[in-house]
Amino acid sequence: MSALREKLDHLIGQTELEVSEKQRSQLVGYVELLNKWNKAYNLTSVRDPQEMMVKHILDSIIVSTHLQGKRFIDVGTGPGLPGIPLSIMNPDCEFYLLDSLGKRIRFIKQVIHELGIDNVVPIQSRVEEFQPEEKFDAVLSRAFASMTDMVEWCHHLPKEQSGVFLALKGQHPRDEIDLLPEWCSVTDIKALQVPELDGERHLVTLSRQG
C-alpha cells in the first residue's frame, strides 16, 4: 500500500465518512495527478502530497454529507476543488466545474479521463458569463471570493425556489455575513471537523429571501 493511501485511510478513519475501495483509489489517483501537474502548471500552493490529503481531499469530502440535491456547480474550482473529490464521493450526482483559466480545465479533463470519472462537466468561463440550460441545486465555493461577491456573481445559477449557495470558509465569517445583500440570507452555518487540519472550517448555507 502506498504512503498516500495509508495517509488517506488514516484520515478517513477519524471521520464518519463511508468511502469505498474504488473511491479511495480515485482520491489517491487525483492527488498523484495534482502533484505531477503542479510541478509544471502551479495549480496549488500546497507542494507536499501528504499535505494535499488533508488540505484538499479531506477538506473537500467532509462536505459530502451536507449536500442535498443531484446537480451542483463548483465555481472558481481551480484544479477541481472541492468538485473532483465530491464527484468521487457522490457518483450519482452531476458536478459542473467552472474556472476561467484554461490550464486548470485541461488538468480537470485529464483527471476525469484517467480516473474514469463520468459525472463531471468541466467548463472554461467567467462565472458571470456562464448561462446554464438548467439551474443547480447548489452553488459550491471554496476559496473563490467573499460571500457577497459569490452570491452577486452567481445569483443566476441556483434553482429559483430550492437552490442554495454553499460557501466553504475558514473562521466563522461574521464580517462577511454583515455585508450580504438584503435578498440573501444565511440559513445554516456548520462547524466542520477536518482531521489534522490547523484552523477552523465552516460550511455556510445561503439562500434567497422569501
Swiss-Prot record:
GO MF terms held by the record: rRNA (guanine-N7-)-methyltransferase activity
Pfam families per record: GidB
Residues reported in the UniProt entry to bind S-adenosyl-L-methionine: G76, L81, V127, E128, R142
EC number: 2.1.1.170
SUPFAM superfamilies: S-adenosyl-L-methionine-dependent methyltransferases
Chief place where the protein resides: cytoplasm
Domain of life: Bacteria
Keywords recorded for this protein, A-Z: Cytoplasm, Methyltransferase, rRNA processing, S-adenosyl-L-methionine, Transferase
CDD domains from the UniProt entry: AdoMet_MTases
One annotated Gene Ontology cellular component of this protein: cytosol
Compartmental location: Cytoplasm
Reactions catalysed, as given in the entry: guanosine(527) in 16S rRNA + S-adenosyl-L-methionine = N(7)-methylguanosine(527) in 16S rRNA + S-adenosyl-L-homocysteine
Family matches, as NCBIfam families: rsmG_gidB
Family assignment from sequence similarity: Belongs to the methyltransferase superfamily. RNA methyltransferase RsmG family.
Function text: Specifically methylates the N7 position of guanine in position 527 of 16S rRNA.
Protein name in the entry: Ribosomal RNA small subunit methyltransferase G
